[in-house]
A protein has these predicted regions:
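Negatively charged, low-complexity tracts enriched in Asp/Glu with abundant Ser/Thr
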Residues: 1-20
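Intrinsic disorder/low-complexity signal
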Residues: 2-3, 13, 38, 76, ...
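Generic low-complexity, intrinsically disordered sequence content enriched
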Residues: 12, 33, 71-75
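A short, structured beta-strand/loop element
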Residues: 24-55
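Active-site scaffold segments
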Residues: 56-60
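Mixed-charge, Lys/Arg-enriched low-complexity segments
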Residues: 61-85
Length: 85
């Protein structure tokens, strides 16, 4: 199987597809040497092409499961923290 990538979504764009922040975040499924990952990474625009930065994280299934559990177990605390002024 060749290395491949599938874009799941982007964070930091308006409804017209224009970036609202300097380095938007892309969420992608990717594979490398028959291993599958989810990649959450900041991107920058270079000559009208989005390119990845080193700022991000690549997770395998076990790591993603652990992250999702942490987020789900703490969703109330996270929402409260982010809502406080």
């Amino acid at each position: 199987m060749p290395d491949e990538s599938k874009n799941l979504g982007k964070i930091g764009f308006d409804n017209n597809g224009e970036p609202k922040i300097r380095e938007p975040i892309f969420v992608k499924l990717s594979s490398y040497r028959n291993a599958k990952f989810i990649d959450i990474r900041k991107y920058y625009e270079d000559n009208e092409e989005w390119k990845p930065t080193k700022k991000g994280v690549t997770l395998n299934k076990e790591q993603l499961d652990e992250l999702l559990k942490i987020l789900n177990d703490n969703v109330n605390d996270i929402n409260k923290w982010l809502s406080e002024e």
